[in-house]
Amino acid sequence: MPQLNPIPWVFLFFLVWLVLGFLGLQKFTSVVTTTLDDSSEEVEVKSKEYSWPW
C-alpha cells in the first residue's frame, strides 16, 4: 500500500476549515451588525425613557 503525502491533505484540511470559518464569521458578523443596529436603537429609546439609577 503506497504511503500518501500528508502535505496536500493538511493543506486541504486547513483550506476547508478556513473557508468554513470565513463563512461562519461572515454570518456571525452580519447577525452581530443587525443586533447592534437594533440594540443601538433600543438603547437610545431606553436612555430617553429611564434616568440614571443613582
Swiss-Prot record:
The keyword Nucleus does not apply. The keyword Phosphoprotein does not apply. It is found in: Mitochondrion membrane. Signal peptide: none annotated. InterPro entries: ATP8_metazoa (IPR001421), ATPase_protein_8 (IPR050635). Keywords: ATP synthesis, CF(0), Hydrogen ion transport, Ion transport, Membrane, Mitochondrion, Transmembrane, Transmembrane helix, Transport. Its main location: mitochondrion. The chain crosses the membrane at residues 9-25. Belongs to the ATPase protein 8 family. Component of the ATP synthase complex composed at least of ATP5F1A/subunit alpha, ATP5F1B/subunit beta, ATP5MC1/subunit c (homooctomer), MT-ATP6/subunit a, MT-ATP8/subunit 8, ATP5ME/subunit e, ATP5MF/subunit f, ATP5MG/subunit g, ATP5MK/subunit k, ATP5MJ/subunit j, ATP5F1C/subunit gamma, ATP5F1D/subunit delta, ATP5F1E/subunit epsilon, ATP5PF/subunit F6, ATP5PB/subunit b, ATP5PD/subunit d, ATP5PO/subunit OSCP. Subunit 8, of the mitochondrial membrane ATP synthase complex (F(1)F(0) ATP synthase or Complex V) that produces ATP from ADP in the presence of a proton gradient across the membrane which is generated by electron transport complexes of the respiratory chain. ATP synthase complex consist of a soluble F(1) head domain - the catalytic core - and a membrane F(1) domain - the membrane proton channel. These two domains are linked by a central stalk rotating inside the F(1) region and a stationary peripheral stalk. This is ATP synthase F(0) complex subunit 8. It comes from Branchiostoma lanceolatum.
